[in-house]
Amino acid sequence: MLCLSLMRIFCSKCLEEQECPLPWELEKYEIWVKKEAETNEKWGEDPYNRPIERLLKYSVINLDKPSGPTSHQVVAWVRDIVGVKAGHGGTLDPKVTGVLPIAIGEATKVLQTLLIAGKEYVALMHLHKEVSEKDIIKVMSKFVGTIIQTPPLRSAVKKRPRKKKVYCIKIIEIDGKDVLFRVSTQGGVYIRKLIHDIGVKLGVGAHMQELRRIKSGPFHENNSVYLQDIVDSLYFWKEEGNEEYIRKVFLPVEEAVKHLKKIYILDSAVAAIVHGANLAVPGIAKLYSNIKKGDLVSIHTLKGELVAIGIALMDSKEMLEKKRGIAVDIERVFMKPGLYPKMWVSQG
């Protein structure tokens, strides 16, 4: 019988050839330069060298959730350890282990971006009767693409059929009635229900034996940390001044938007956006080449700091070629005022 009790080790070492990438990981792009510019080192900060005191109030932890507690309980423990508000980026059932991104302090606002990033799991399905490998492969392949899924009875959302996307299913091993497989999906897909539906389609029934999330958007289990790492990293920083450990645990908030297409702006445009303006074309320094109208994009300084996120009103080519117009409708601002000076001229 297959077992996932050592799934973190198993996944890290044995599944490299069974990758199930998320759509954003497959996108190819270049960085187009619209305007050659440099950033003033007097303003802002290197996001990967933020003062620890600020990092502890504005960061993300790639936590490996243990089996047993609810996601809410885990977040409460982290909040008590750090002494700052916290939130998680996607609920895991108590018995499910794996990647649970936890945002600290002001970084909690970034969690919404993970909803579109997709998830990846390794699951152990137990069939109620033996089925040929050929039939298992044939049926499971039919669940890749757009599926109709009704949330399970115990879920908190309304029990109505929903269209959801399954990006990839790859079978790792079949041992009698047990099927170990890897699956990547958009957010909101219930793997337990997916397995139930596969069992129904096979005509024998099935249930989920064990589940581990190995990826949530840009966060992967390979660089996840345990609850004890949070405690230890804080101790070594406070007692010994060791920053290396704590910087591996408390990641810059910019790590949480790695899956988004990016636009880098001039120093002179930063304060305007921080104070509520949309991003105008003249403020763009460089950008990803694969931006489409309607994409959720992240706006960054030339140092890499996250300024805001918003909806692209132009594609990359238009942003590069046009001299004026609004390029991005800003939805949420992350940067606090004061890090960059105001450089616009007041009217009237």
Swiss-Prot record:
GO annotation, biological process: box H/ACA sno(s)RNA 3'-end processing; mRNA pseudouridine synthesis; rRNA pseudouridine synthesis; snRNA pseudouridine synthesis; tRNA pseudouridine synthesis
Catalytic activity annotation: uridine(55) in tRNA = pseudouridine(55) in tRNA
GO molecular function terms noted in the UniProt entry: RNA binding; tRNA pseudouridine(55) synthase activity
Active site per the UniProt annotation: 93
SUPFAM superfamilies found in the cross-reference section: Pseudouridine synthase, PUA domain-like
Chain ranges of the PUA domain: 260-335
Domain of life per record: Archaea
Pfam families: DKCLD, PUA, TruB_C_2, TruB_N
EC assignment: 5.4.99.25
CDD domains in the cross-refs: PseudoU_synth_hDyskerin (cd02572), PUA_Cbf5 (cd21148)
Keywords: Isomerase, tRNA processing
The protein's role, per its UniProt record: Could be responsible for synthesis of pseudouridine from uracil-55 in the psi GC loop of transfer RNAs.
Family: Belongs to the pseudouridine synthase TruB family. Type 2 subfamily.
HAMAP family: TruB_arch (MF_01081)
Protein name: Probable tRNA pseudouridine synthase B
Species in which this protein is naturally found: Nanoarchaeum equitans (strain Kin4-M)
Gene name tied to this protein: truB
